[in-house]
Amino acid sequence: MENTRRLLLTLLLCGTSASAQVPDDDWDFEEGYRAQMLYLHALVNYAYDLEWQYEWERRQFADNSLRINTGSVASDKLLTDIDLNINQPLNEKWRFMGRFTRNGFRWRPVREDRLLVGLERSILDSSAVYLTVNPEFDKEFIDVAAGYTFYKDNREQYVRIGVLAEDFDWDIKNRFAGQQDQRAITVQWALRLSLANNWWLYSDGEVGSGFERTFPDPAESPDISRHDRRENMAQVRLTRRESDGKAWSAWISWYDFNELKEFRPPGFDYDYRNTVLNVAVEHTRIIGERHRLRLLAHYVDQQAESIGFNAHNYDRQDILGGVFYEYLWPMSGVTFAYALGQPDITYTAPDSTDNYDLDDYRDKLILGWRYTFSEDAQIRLSISHEVSAHGFGGGAVQFQMFF
């Protein structure tokens, strides 16, 4: 266990940075636009099971925790999400606090790797304050986060509210003589509260103003003259879990991204926005001693547009579903599943030859295997076959551990 903790604490030393450049026709923002199975992969085939999600929400601040979700989405693309939480007591008042998050390429325009490490101190019997930083190699990209948390029931109920100051020292440390007209200040929250009749309310998110930056000196910044970015996200979830293995969950998640860039070379300026709304329900139940049924449904609405470079409008709605049957043994189980997706995609641009509509029905047959190492660790392996597209549907590995 101690070796595991050392290994995962070492992982917290990872981080990334980003730099601006003139865009080209192979625009990352349009990654996934034509992928009719984009949401079928991410939200059905490779989604965390309701039981796993419930345990993660319950224990993410009570214990140290790690979960990894990786699955193939194309012959040359691998979707990988990582969440690592460290809540290590140091004495009666202090805890080491660390969080590493990687959001793989899904519907989001940019992949995110975020690291925050610091300390949490109890100030009353049921509350604490914290301060964390992102020890980025390039100092202009160091983030600072601080906040307050109210805890209850051994930290399994909580209300956490904080503020994240992104690129805290960017004005002084940036290498391009840039000026910041608006700092990126973000409100972050996470809460889990018990309601009546075994229902639980969970929510997390971060909402802020984003940054606005100008680069007045062409000698220091020969390509870009202005850069604004805002990225917000939130989710609300209601879950009910009973002792006989039945569970219900319904949730809404929202994601909004906006980036504006102005370049000194003509013809590259753009104002890009991407908004995704996802409404979902999930149900699981044990039938007898050996059988488990899991039902999942999503409705996704995505709206994106670019003004200027690569001007376009992107309108997408997906209806998704999955039926998962698991045959159970004491420490493991084998899953047979059918997943389906009906996308409705419309892409319009000033040049009508660039326009397209996609609405092909997509479905998968999935074979999976789960093994429970202990009440604190599980792994799932799966492979799938694309029925309507007549091809291999990808393999996936999911792992979740508390320590």
Regions found by a protein language model. Name each.
Residues 48-50, 70-74, 100-106, 133-139, ...:
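Transmembrane beta-strands of outer-membrane beta-barrel pores
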Residues 107-110, 140-143, 157, 168-174, ...:
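Outer-membrane beta-barrel proteins
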Residues 86-88, 119-121, 148-152, 191-199, ...:
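Residue-level signature of outer-membrane beta-barrel architecture
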